[in-house]
Amino acid sequence: LSAGYYDAYYNKANKVREVLKQDFQKVFDSGVDVIITPTTPTTAFGFGEKSDPLAMYMADIFTVTANLTHMPAISIPSGYDNNGMPFGIQMTAQQGNEDILFSISQDFEKNA
C-alpha cells in the first residue's frame, strides 16, 4: 500500500475484520458449533470458461469471511448439478474447534 493510503485502507480493513470476528463470536457463543454455507455462489465453471478476473474472484466470495476472521473452515464436495459440475459446502467453526470440523465433514462425506 502507498504510504498515503495505509491509514485509510489497512487500518479500516482491520476494524472491519474485528467487527466480523465479534459477530461470528456472538453466533458461536449462542450455542452454534458450526456455520454451514455454500462454498461458492454457483457450481464450478469449466476449465478456461471464465476469463474475467472479477468473476473468478467473486466465485470465492463465500470463503473470504473465514479467511478474514481467522476462523477455521473446511470445504467438502456435496453434489453435482444437472451438467455434472461439482458444488460444495463450507463449514466454519470458532478458533480452536478444528476437531469439530473434521468430525462433521468426515461424517457428511461417509453418509452423502
What feature does the model see in each segment?
Residues 1, 40-43:
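Short glycine-rich anion-binding loops that position phosphate/pyrophosphate groups of nucleotides
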Residues 1-22, 53, 57, 68-112:
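Structural helix-boundary/capping segments
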Residues 23-24, 62:
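Residues within well-ordered alpha-helices
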Residues 28-29, 67:
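Anion (oxyanion) recognition and catalysis
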Residues 32-33:
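Short, high-confidence coil segments that cap the C-terminus of an alpha-helix
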Residues 45-55:
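Glycine/threonine-rich flexible loop motifs
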Residues 59-65:
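Thioredoxin-like thiol-disulfide oxidoreductase module
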